[in-house]
Regions:
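Helix-loop-beta segment of a Rossmann-like dinucleotide-binding subdomain
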Residues: 153-167, 217-226, 277-288
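Short beta-strand/turn micro-motifs composed of small residues
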Residues: 11, 34, 87, 114, ...
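Rossmann-like NAD(P)(H) cofactor-binding subdomain of soluble oxidoreductases
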Residues: 60-153
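NAD(P)+-binding Rossmann beta1-loop-alpha1 motif at the extreme N-terminus of oxidoreductases
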Residues: 1-59, 182
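NAD(P)-dependent Rossmann-like dehydrogenase/reductase catalytic/cofactor-binding core
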Residues: 238-319
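Generic structural signal for well-ordered, non-membrane alpha-helical segments
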Residues: 16, 172, 176, 229-237, ...
């Protein structure tokens, strides 16, 4: 393993660019593996905006100075210490590229960030547990502007790290410390966790059902907060939380009493007020982009719930 970690980020979208910025700041030798259609844009470099809590003029920051690859052959010609998967859960399963990339990247540590309940099990087909680190994405990033008239001097990727946030990572003791050390050296607030999959399973279940309900309400907070919509979402969220707890051998007992329609009524306006961007528009834009992933995750709750003999009737798609 080299002193300067050689890092390959798969996917140079909203998330890949942000992790790339921190890893480059840590001194990593950085490359992206992108689809051919994005290669020119990536080679020109990206424009980043870091959002704070205060509304002030935004300074675009140029993010460049990394390699750009478009094929496994190019990747296989180099040695890698870390491979970061910055794509959706559905992109992981599209074709056979993950297995091929695993063969092209030798003994590298793989860092997965995907949210679906069975992503880790799925990846273990190709990457042994001794080399697989799991992380959760605590920031929000998006292509800016989200809508016309916003305060960005030119198009780019905006990101917001909520105050006091720590991004959890878990994995084998021989690999995890180096990933965390590297991120911290770049100024990223990383922390070690016993089991990220378990930490995030329940919040992710609530978020997924919420997003599914918001989509059914036409991405409108006002319509989402109406009685019938809230009732449906709260029942489905209870089922998803129980599936998530059962699958990760965790407990839902502390969360279930809190899961009430009133919780969404209370939290949504607070969240909208705290975010330094238009939350309603972000949710619509982002979760339309990863809509297939939300459907995959909903189906996964149903499949795993049925297998475990748990109720799933409110998680089923409406006909
Ligand atoms: N952005 C956020 O605020 C945020 C927050 C928390 C979690 N996440 C999660 O992070 C994941 C990525 O989100 P994102 O916002 O970064 O999405 P994104 O902006 O769409 O970026 C993903 C990029 O990876 C590309 N890609 C897909 N398969 C690839 C492959 N085999 N090789 C190389 N590139 C590939 C995609 O291409 P195409 O455009 O052709 O699909 C896209 O350019 C999702 O699971 C999302 O739910 C995102």
């Amino acid at each position: 393993m080299s002193e300067t970690p050689r890092v390959l980020l798969v996917g140079a979208g909203a998330v890949g660019q942000v992790f790339g910025k921190y890893l480059q700041a840590a001194g990593c030798e950085l490359s992206f593996l992108v689809k051919e259609k994005y290669a020119d844009e990536a080679r020109r470099g990206f424009t980043l905006y870091e959002l704070g809590m205060l509304e002030k003029d935004l300074e675009p920051v140029v993010f460049s100075g990394f390699g750009v690859h478009v094929s496994n052959e190019e990747v296989a010609a180099r040695r890698w210490d870390q491979v970061w998967l910055c794509v959706s859960s559905t992109a992981l399963r599209a074709g056979s590229w993950v297995g091929e990339l695993a063969r092209a990247t030798g003994d590298a540590t793989w860092v997965m960030l995907q949210p679906s309940l069975d992503d880790r099990d799925w990846l273990l087909q190709w990457i042994p547990a001794e080399r697989l680190v799991s992380g959760m994405i605590p920031f929000i990033s998006f292509h800016a502007p989200l809508k016309p008239g916003e305060r960005f001097p030119k198009p780019g990727t905006a990101f917001w790290m909520p105050p006091m946030t720590k991004g959890p990572f878990s994995g084998p003791s021989e690999r995890l410390p180096r990933v965390i050390r590297t991120l911290r050296a770049g100024g990223y607030p990383a922390r070690a966790s016993q089991d990220v999959a378990r930490d995030v399973a329940i919040p992710s279940a609530v978020l997924t059902v919420f997003v599914n309900g918001l989509e059914a309400a036409g991405w409108s907070f006002e319509r989402f907060l109406q009685h019938d919509s809230l009732e449906r979402v709260h029942r489905a969220a209870r089922e998803a939380v129980q599936v998530a707890a059962s699958h990760t051998k965790g407990s839902a007992s502390a969360v279930l009493p809190l899961l009430r329609p009133a919780l969404f009524k209370l939290m949504l306006p607070i969240a909208a007020r705290l975010t330094p961007f238009d939350l309603e528009t972000y949710l619509k834009v982002h979760f339309t982009k990863v809509g297939e992933q939300t459907r995959l995750m909903m189906k996964t709750y149903v499949d795993l719930g049925r297998r475990a003999g748990l109720p799933v009737e409110h998680l089923l798609p409406a006909h």
